[in-house]
């Protein structure tokens, strides 16, 4: 996948040079380019913002540098242009899966009080991280890009690595443990030490269902329980 990020602060995306995403870039599963919108302004003072017509607080990003940067990137990247803004569709795991199927994407990070409405003509989709205020689109873009890239073939090494994670299948993840087997008097559940893979799988599914119902009842309500799920829960409750 190729991703181009249009931003006023390209240095913020150096985080992608590290950890899982950094290795994916090194191994050429992924390419992430940052484009400084300021490089495209025709303003002699390199300004990319101005006061809003009609008055009001704050500044608005001008259409010209945004549009010109999009047009330039579009010469090589034919992907959807995605703007990170409050009016967009709320990002979730389903949307991450959808976008992970694309070969190319372009992300536009806004700043100040927003962008000139005329720039929207060049935007294909708007995405919001949630109902709260951030300093700029960069803050939303980083976790969104990370979430998408984790789903790409080869990035995590195994599909099981992300299929077991919270939200992937509509449920929160089961509890995890590592050595030592006993810490401060608290022991790891015996089933995890048993080596019985089928029982471990059932325990994890039961805990995932129970935790989701307790912590995120909204997610649990959307999840369609299978007959196998019901049996796993029934058997789990019998052992309590």
From Swiss-Prot:
Disulfide bonds: none annotated. It comes from Clostridium botulinum (strain Loch Maree / Type A3). Its EC number is 2.1.1.228. GO terms for biological process: tRNA N1-guanine methylation. This is tRNA (guanine-N(1)-)-methyltransferase. The gene is trmD. It catalyses: guanosine(37) in tRNA + S-adenosyl-L-methionine = N(1)-methylguanosine(37) in tRNA + S-adenosyl-L-homocysteine + H(+). Its main location: cytoplasm. Keywords: Cytoplasm, Methyltransferase, S-adenosyl-L-methionine, Transferase, tRNA processing. GO terms for cellular component: cytosol. It is an enzyme of class 2 (transferase). It comes from the Bacteria. S-adenosyl-L-methionine binds at residues 110, 129-134. Pfam families: tRNA_m1G_MT.
């Amino acid at each position: 996948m190729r991703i181009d990020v249009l931003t006023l602060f390209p240095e913020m995306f150096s985080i992608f040079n590290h950890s899982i995403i950094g290795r994916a870039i090194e191994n050429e599963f992924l390419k992430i380019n940052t484009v400084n919108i300021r490089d495209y302004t025709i303003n002699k003072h390199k300004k990319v913002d101005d006061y809003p017509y009609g008055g009001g607080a704050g500044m608005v990003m001008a259409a010209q540098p945004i549009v010109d940067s999009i047009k330039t990137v579009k010469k090589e990247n034919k992907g959807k242009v995605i703007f990170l803004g409050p009016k967009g569709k709320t990002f979730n795991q389903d949307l991450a899966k959808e976008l992970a199927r694309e070969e190319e994407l372009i992300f536009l990070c806004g700043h100040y009080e927003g962008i000139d409405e005329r720039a929207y003509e060049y935007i294909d989709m708007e995405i919001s991280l949630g109902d709260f205020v951030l300093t700029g689109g960069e803050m939303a873009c980083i976790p969104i890009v990370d979430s998408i890239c984790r789903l790409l073939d080869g990035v995590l090494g195994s599909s099981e690595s992300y299929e077991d994670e919270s939200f992937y299948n509509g449920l929160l993840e089961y509890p995890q443990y590592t050595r030592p087997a006993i810490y401060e008097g608290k022991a790891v559940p015996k089933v995890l030490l048993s080596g019985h893979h089928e029982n471990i799988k059932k325990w994890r599914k039961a805990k995932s269902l129970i935790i989701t119902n307790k912590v995120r009842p909204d997610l649990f309500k959307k999840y369609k329980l299978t007959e196998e799920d019901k049996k796993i829960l029934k058997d789990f409750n019998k052992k309590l």
